Amino acid sequence: MAINEPEFATAVAVATKKRTFKKFSFRGFNVDALLKMSNVDLAKLFNARVRRRFYRGLKKQPLILIKKLRRAKKEASDENKMKPEVVKTHLRNMIIVPEMIGSVVGVHNGKKFNEIVIKPEMIGHYLAEFSMTCKKVNHHRPRICGCCCFRRSTRFIPLR
């Protein structure tokens, strides 16, 4: 069975069709437009809780964090690194703004610093949402073995 020329051409066109990925937009604005916006215009795009926080003004500590992130990004671009250096912080209540995209932030969870790479999808969220303070506990069933596990077990397990 021979394939006709037009059918073959359409089959090749379908096979070579490149996948197009959806560009990120936050409330209808792309990342470049978000970077150019002032804080007042940007606050209008956020939900009520974040908007209220922006209107009350950014304090000294969040501004220092943004300054450190700028410096880390600049050093990474000067040295042609793929990722900027990790900037550690305890500011879990910091709101992620477009200027932070591409940065690596170490957010303290009470025990250690969890590294977070800031992506465009994270805009408007708090840093704490990406650094969990507690982990899921895996409970194991009590078991009897030849070592000291038997003495530590608090449950009665009948012998067979």
Curated annotation (Swiss-Prot):
Gene3D superfamilies: 30s Ribosomal Protein S19, Chain A (3.30.860.10). GO terms for cellular component: cytosolic small ribosomal subunit. Pfam families: Ribosomal_S19. The keyword Magnesium does not apply. PROSITE patterns: RIBOSOMAL_S19. HAMAP family: Ribosomal_uS19. Belongs to the universal ribosomal protein uS19 family. This is Small ribosomal subunit protein uS19v. It comes from Arabidopsis thaliana (Mouse-ear cress). The gene is RPS15F.
